[in-house]
Design a protein with these regions (language model features):
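Catalytic cores of the polymerase beta-like nucleotidyltransferase superfamily
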Residues: 3-369
């Protein structure tokens, strides 16, 4: 028997690799259905009528394909929101209607929350939110989504509906807008930050120059977005090792600096000491923000003015900022002084000021570790 030619071998390798991945995707989604309360929602919707359907969509499908941890589950259905409510009532599943005007009902089972969104088509947009009509067309719903990698649906058996080849883009490392990129951005300017997040997480290629031009042309539209949504997206971008990836991509970094000019210390992360590098993934978002914005000026106060965070987090950030503005030397970190600081401010505050000193030092003194 003749050995396959090189081009044929490459084709066969890719074919069997994709086939194996499809088996994994199917098995993983079946596992999620069987081992989480999602199975009750699938049963409630699928049994509502002969034509009712429900599928996994968006981030949970994307994460399964990339073999990432699935931390939340979004669902799409061809039922209207009122029909979804009726279907859930029939199975005694609790829900609330907070997002009903946008087509989303949130089901609650065993303290788990599942967003169930009706298929939609956009009627009008204002750069923040869209006015929608409900639809029965799965492809029409997919066409209004932002990126091909987020327009992949899957039923409870793991069968994919992928009208824009999002799975292929995801596996090959392409971040492609659906349709006209500028139109997609102008529908919701938060998509600029979402593009950066997905690019940093999944792309294997340089930015398309045309996409960067479009983003820069429309970047002022970010001012239309609420501070809560901006902070939420920044948190996702900087989670895990996203910030370290950002520092290696100059175009992404420049865009982040335009959108968040308060992050004045961001380039300092290029020269972290060895201890800081080793422990970087252990720090939480608010402490990360302290490292990014506290610089001895009113910058931290300005950040808190621009962006809404909880009062508890505000207090924590202000405490680190106040401490930094004092004339702090290594002698400040004596056991006596730290005990006094602990007495007035608590354990977390002591940890924060020590870590803040460590992360802002070129080398780390043993007495701080």
């Amino acid at each position: 028997m003749l050995a396959p030619q090189p081009f044929m071998k490459n084709f066969l390798d890719k074919f069997f690799s994709r086939s194996k991945n499809l088996d994994y995707i199917s098995q993983k989604l079946k596992q999620i259905t069987l081992t989480t309360p999602a199975n009750k929602i699938f049963e409630a919707i699928n049994n509502f009528s002969e034509k009712s359907e429900i599928r996994y969509v968006g981030g949970c499908v994307r994460k399964v394909i990339k073999k990432e941890n699935v931390d939340d589950i979004d669902l799409a259905t061809n039922l209207t929101p009122l029909e979804v409510c009726e279907a859930l009532k029939n199975k005694q599943i609790s829900y609330y209607e907070t997002g009903i005007e946008h087509g989303t009902i949130t089901a609650i089972i065993d303290e788990y929350k599942y967003e169930i969104t009706s298929l939609r088509k956009d009627v009008s947009t204002d750069g923040r939110h869209a006015e929608v009509e409900f639809s029965l067309d799965w492809k029409e719903d997919a066409s209004r989504r932002d990126f091909t990698i987020n327009s992949i649906y899957a039923d409870s058996d793991g069968n994919l509906f992928d009208p824009f080849n999002g799975k292929k883009d995801l596996e090959e490392g392409y971040i492609n807008f659906i349709g006209n990129a500028e139109k997609r951005i102008q529908e919701d300017y938060l998509r600029i930050l979402r593009y950066l997040r997905f690019y940093l997480n999944y792309s294997n290629y340089k930015h398309q120059s045309q996409i960067i031009k479009i983003i820069k042309k429309n970047i002022d539209g970010i001012s239309n977005i609420s501070s809560e949504r901006l902070i939420g997206e920044l948190k996702k971008i900087t989670s895990s090792n996203g910030l370290l990836k950002l520092l290696k991509d100059q175009e992404s970094l420049e865009l982040i600096e335009i959108i968040f000019p308060q992050l004045k210390n961001i380039k300092n992360f290029k020269k972290l000491n060895s201890y800081a590098v080793e422990n970087f993934l252990k720090i939480d978002f608010i402490f990360l923000i302290s490292l990014l914005v506290i610089d001895g000026t009113d910058n931290a106060d300005y950040f808190l003015y621009k962006f809404k965070i909880s009062k508890k987090d505000q207090k924590r950030l202000k405490l680190i900022d106040h401490f930094y503005r004092e004339k702090v030397t290594l002698n400040t970190y004596t056991e006596k002084n730290l005990n006094k600081f602990f007495y007035f401010n608590g354990r977390q505050a002591v940890i924060d000021i020590i870590n803040f000193k460590i992360f802002n030092s070129n080398t780390v003194k043993k007495k701080l570790i």
